[in-house]
Amino acid sequence: MQSTLSQSPGSRFSQYMALTKPRVTQLAVFCAVIGMFLATPGMVPWHVLIGGTVGIWLLAGAAFAINCLVEQKIDAMMRRTAWRPSARGEITTPQILLFSAVLGSVGAWTLYTFTNPLTMWLTIATFVGYAVIYTLLLKPMTPQNIVIGGASGAMPPALGWAAVTGAVPGDAWILVLIIFVWTPPHFWVLALYRRKDYENAGLPMLPVTHGEKFTRLHILLYTVILFAVTLMPFISGMSGAVYLTSAVLLGAVFLAYAWKIHRDYSDELARKAFRYSIVYLSLLFAALLVDHYARPLLGV
């Protein structure tokens, strides 16, 4: 184990940042920010935008730090995650707990102060859903971990919406539903080409418990459902033609990947599909934002 005294402040900072899973956090916070803007026809007040963004990021980082702590032995057995400082023993359990507690406390205070109590409590509930219910209970016990546990990961748009309005109306839940349905195919393509990793770690991911063929079929089925669900913002009147066009085009590409995986699987194809799924969700929510402000300008 590397001595903590021999590390530079910059190296130590990078290790703690790694615990927050920055790439995953960025996507979650991005979806939350989009939720903020969709909640109002005008601009989001600056104190809400900044306070909400920072508070949600801090609590998300706190949840991911707990995830790294709980799964440090599992991470050490997987090639994809063995580099994490928690898996390498470079940060101790008390240090991770303290780090998570500080992030979570400051995040909760920030949300309470700059947004509203509802946003704070919803974000804390999301923290519990991910760090406790998903990480401790669902992930090691059932192949449906991603399906059930995806509820907590799908919450960011509702958190952003609540930060602005103090409520979570039907339109916000449509956005939550999109991410909820997107989550299984996104993670299952990863689990397909990382199947050996999950087998070695003893995690009951779908390809491990039900096989590759079953997983490929369910990726296709969930992607078809996702395509239909992404039409709901247009059907409900929340979004217009700009979003609809984007959703159809982006969804068609995702469907093409899912169909190819179902018919002619390869690890390289699964890697490409996994990377595209991240781009897909980012562009889909960006299209929601563009459509939201373009509709008044276009008079529709």
UniProtKB/Swiss-Prot annotation:
- Indicate yes or no for the key word Cell membrane: yes
What are its E.C. numbers? 2.5.1.141
Matching Gene3D superfamilies: UbiA prenyltransferase
Which reactions is this enzyme annotated as catalysing? heme b + (2E,6E)-farnesyl diphosphate + H2O = Fe(II)-heme o + diphosphate
* Sorted UniProt keywords: Cell inner membrane, Cell membrane, Heme biosynthesis, Membrane, Transferase, Transmembrane, Transmembrane helix
Q: Where in the cell is the protein located?
A: Cell inner membrane
> What is known about what this protein does?
Converts heme B (protoheme IX) to heme O by substitution of the vinyl group on carbon 2 of heme B porphyrin ring with a hydroxyethyl farnesyl side group.
**Additional information:** Carbon 2 of the heme B porphyrin ring is defined according to the Fischer nomenclature.
The name of this protein is Protoheme IX farnesyltransferase
Q: Which organism is it from?
A: Burkholderia cenocepacia (strain HI2424)
